[in-house]
Amino acid sequence: RPGVMDKLGLGYDVLKEINPRIIYAAVSGFGCYGPYHLRPGYDILAQAMGGMMSITGSKGGEPTRAGSALGDILGGLHVTIGILAAVNARTITGKGQRVDVSLMDSMIAATENTALKYIETGNIPAPMGNRYAAVSPYDSFTCKGGKVIIAAGNQKLYEKLCNEVLERPDMITCLLYTSPSPRD
């Protein structure tokens, strides 16, 4: 939790006086500043407040936690990247630095184009199951043998799907399906 190491006399400002080359990393639920900085941070809270739970799950369903501790995992990866960048900077400058990562920030970053779309349009994103907003078809589909995943991530793959799997080359040039959005 932010502030604990300072109370123990082991905060970054104290340690950098002893060793100016120190790289000091901290991971918390909500960062060192702001209204929630003293609150405990758990993965499920980071997933909820970072927006991930609002876009995970079935369309029209309840907010759903990702199947793994994604906030914890991404927080660890982000702090690792920060430490490596700080080591590289120290090689150049000779100085250490503080690396601060919050689980919530990591989850916001993981929402990628969904967060950007909200900022751009003001529309609140909703869960869409296995679909992906920028690519279509990209989903699980029921077929005679059970379920199949189709992910035509670009036009070349879409054309291959139409020609070789669906045997429907007419769908490639049909105005209804010329770009990913109408294919939904």
Model-derived features with residue positions:
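Rossmann-like NAD(P)-binding element
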Residues: 1-5
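A short, hydrophobic C-terminal helix/tail in secreted or cell-surface proteins
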Residues: 180-184
